[in-house]
């Protein structure tokens, strides 16, 4: 993408158009839906009927919303990129209309993935994101010789094709594990001729749906402060110089890799067992699992942060600097990436402790925490942007993560938290590994610099 679109007005247009669908993708994929759905699904006595109704309700609402945007996308385009001029808005509007349909596709993917989580099947969910990226890459390769505007249309349809591929990936495990039959039979259960059974199922479904939606909306808010903050940063960045939206997007994409690979993956895999342990009142088991996950995440995310900051320019250059992506774009993107990485530990560790809140069905408390950190982060963005420009937005995002972490730990309980982190041996191992990494990277950078200078002067 950086090779073909670079970091300018056309890349900004796509990132703005893809921002809202991508926001929903990250919110749903990172657990907001499953952390509300799974506890309700586990507790439901009519699992198939409950799940099928949830799926139909969401699909119906999202389809109508997508249709509304397709018929009149201008209002949403102005909302997403208020700082764009009229000509750029005109180019952006049809791209927004196409990409918005991905909302419906990503919900279906997330819904099917949540059902598979119940059966402890994570393969489809883990690999579905790669299908989206693959389809986007194929679309860009096909449009390589096209104009930038034509490439935007190819890329947008590539997003939709990726969404369909993600859904299809879930079908085989759904059928194999009997979940497809569960959904189908659950829906047919509402058509039974037995009046008593039908009345019981309808009443039970109403209660389950009411309980689910009561938890869902606070869960979305509570689990998506980072995504909403990033969304707001894109809107604010549209007032800055051309390319600012792209710098944020490219840096954030790399930042999301360790976050998704470790923090989100572990929290997603851990959530069903935490929810069941809480239901069975196994507090010691919960604390034991959280402690193991804590030290693993601290170690891995700290090493990723150190490595990413020390090699930020090299990583950005390797991934993006070709074609339309200039050395200046590399420098700014690498600086943004380094500032994003300051928030990797707090954002990643917050995912771990928020599990406890969601498993206890305390979504309202999580939503309150998220709102506070979101407003503090927004205030930081507006304060730092005039001083640091796009770098201020990245720094504010990391500060928002720190606020979120402190507030989540407060809700979890400082005494319980101190009990989890009390392990001197683990801390010493992490400190040793961090020191070794720093020394190795310093030696590596020095060696590469000397090698470059040697061959550079040899050329003369």
Swiss-Prot record:
Q: What is its main location?
A: membrane
Membrane-spanning residues = 4-24, 50-70, 95-115, 122-142, 155-175, 228-248, 257-277, 292-312, 336-356, 366-386, 428-448
Give the subcellular location. Answer: Cell inner membrane
Which keywords label this protein?
A: Cell inner membrane, Cell membrane, Cell shape, Cell wall biogenesis/degradation, Membrane, Peptidoglycan synthesis, Transmembrane, Transmembrane helix, Transport
- Summary of the function given for this chain in its UniProt record: Involved in peptidoglycan biosynthesis. Transports lipid-linked peptidoglycan precursors from the inner to the outer leaflet of the cytoplasmic membrane.
Q: Which family does it belong to?
A: Belongs to the MurJ/MviN family.
Question: What's the protein here called?
Answer: Probable lipid II flippase MurJ
| Gene giving rise to this polypeptide | murJ
């Amino acid at each position: 993408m950086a090779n073909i679109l670079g970091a300018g007005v056309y890349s900004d247009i796509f990132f703005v158009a893809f921002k809202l669908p991508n926001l929903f993708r990250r919110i749903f994929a990172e657990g907001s839906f499953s952390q509300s759905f799974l506890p309700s699904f586990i507790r439901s006595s009519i699992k198939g009927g409950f799940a099928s109704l949830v799926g139909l309700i969401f699909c119906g609402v999202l389809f109508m919303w997508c249709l509304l945007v397709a018929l009149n996308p201008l209002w949403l385009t102005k909302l997403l990129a208020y700082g764009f001029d009229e000509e750029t808005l005109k180019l952006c509007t049809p791209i927004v209309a196409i990409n918005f349909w991905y909302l419906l596709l990503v919900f279906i993917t997330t819904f099917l993935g949540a059902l598979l989580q119940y059966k402890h099947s994570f393969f489809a969910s883990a690999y579905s994101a790669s299908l989206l990226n693959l389809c986007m890459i194929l679309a860009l390769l096909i449009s390589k010789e096209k104009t930038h505007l034509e490439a935007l249309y190819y890329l947008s349809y590539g997003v939709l094709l990726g969404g369909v591929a993600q859904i299809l990936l879930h079908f085989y495990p759904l059928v194999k594990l009997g979940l497809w039959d569960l959904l189908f039979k659950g829906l047919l259960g509402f058509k039974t001729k037995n009046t008593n059974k039908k009345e019981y199922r309808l009443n039970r479904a109403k209660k389950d749906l009411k309980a689910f939606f009561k938890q869902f909306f606070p869960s979305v808010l509570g689990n998506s402060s980072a995504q909403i903050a990033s969304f707001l940063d894109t809107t604010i960045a549209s007032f800055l110089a051309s390319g600012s939206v792209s710098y944020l997007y490219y840096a954030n994409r790399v930042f999301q890799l360790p976050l998704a690979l470790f923090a989100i993956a572990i929290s997603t895999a851990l959530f069903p067992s935490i929810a069941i342990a809480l239901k069975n009142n196994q507090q010691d088991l919960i604390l034991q699992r959280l402690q193991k996950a804590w030290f693993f995440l601290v170690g891995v995310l700290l090493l990723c942060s150190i490595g990413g900051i020390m090699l930020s320019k090299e990583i950005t250059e390797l991934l993006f600097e070709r074609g339309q992506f200039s050395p200046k774009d590399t420098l700014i993107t690498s600086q943004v990436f380094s500032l994003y990485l300051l928030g990797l530990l707090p954002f990643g560790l917050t995912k771990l402790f928020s599990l406890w809140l969601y498993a206890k069905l305390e979504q309202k408390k999580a939503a309150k925490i998220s709102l506070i950190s979101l407003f503090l982060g927004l205030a930081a963005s507006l304060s730092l942007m005039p001083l640091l420009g796009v770098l201020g937005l990245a720094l504010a995002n990391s500060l928002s993560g720190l606020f979120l972490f402190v507030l989540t730990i407060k809700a979890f309980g400082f005494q319980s938290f101190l009990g989890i982190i009390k392990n001197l041996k683990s801390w010493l191992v992490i400190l040793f590994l961090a020191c070794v990494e720093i020394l190795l990277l310093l030696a590596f950078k020095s060696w590469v610099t000397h090698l470059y200078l040697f061959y550079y002067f040899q050329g003369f």
